[in-house]
Amino acid sequence: LMKSQFDFYLRLLPTAEARTRTYWGHAGACFTEQMENFGLPNPAEYGFKRPESYDRGLEYNAWLEYEWDTVLEFCQMILETARYNEADISRYIPLIESSLNFFDEHYRMLASRRGRKELDGEGHLILFPGSACETYKMTNNASSTIAALRTVLETYGRKNEMLEVIPPIPLRYIEVKDSANSITMPVLKQTIAPAKSWERINNVETPQLYPVFPWRVYGIGKEKLEVARNTYFYDPEAVNFRSHIGWKQDNIWAACLGLTEESRQLNLAKLSKGPH
């Protein structure tokens, strides 16, 4: 199954590169999150009634606009296949290179259209506008995108110049009140932020935990485990969106964070008999 998925992306690489050249005039492969077997988004998601002035490379879709990270998950799986199975992945290297190049080229281009500099004051890419999954929209430096780029670049190990310009994962502090004692002052807990900023919430995913899984930046035996656990327990959307139904992966995050009982309960709920 993995090989067929890898080959699917590899087969569509020329289309993804042609999309980028045609719409934006720069290098790199732009894969949309959901696409047809010929490599383009389906017409309904691209948008039948698009404003004339709207960017032709974007889907006119409140959920899917700027959602380009999915290919990076496949790039990482390809790289992990080489590590775990000693597989020859040389044929997929152009896919990995071009997928990474898109983010570097595109966000430099967008920054240069807004102002004189391609990078921020710290020498990092400005990943704006972006999307943290389909949930936090019009993001500046989404944590899911940053974790994806950083992890793939570190595993790939051949693009150190690009790795140096990837911004840090954004963090934030959340006030946590003691429900048993209303007199006690709230405590500030440091958590992973969904992004540096965003304009709206459009779905019910939890991209602030994507640095835990699939990207493994945080976890057992790694630095700042408490920050990731704080995110799981105290981030208001992470708590509100928590579920065992469908594609929800809270059970995986709990396991990666060493929350054994939490993971057990979520797994039991996910594997229980459904209503239909």
Can you describe what each PLM-predicted range is?
Residues 1-15, 26, 62-84, 90, ...:
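Active-site core of glycosidic bond-cleaving carbohydrate-active enzymes
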Residues 1, 13-19, 102-113, 136, ...:
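Secretory-pathway/luminal and periplasmic proteins that interact with or process carbohydrate-rich
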Residues 27-94, 98, 104-168:
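The feature captures the catalytic groove of carbohydrate-active enzymes
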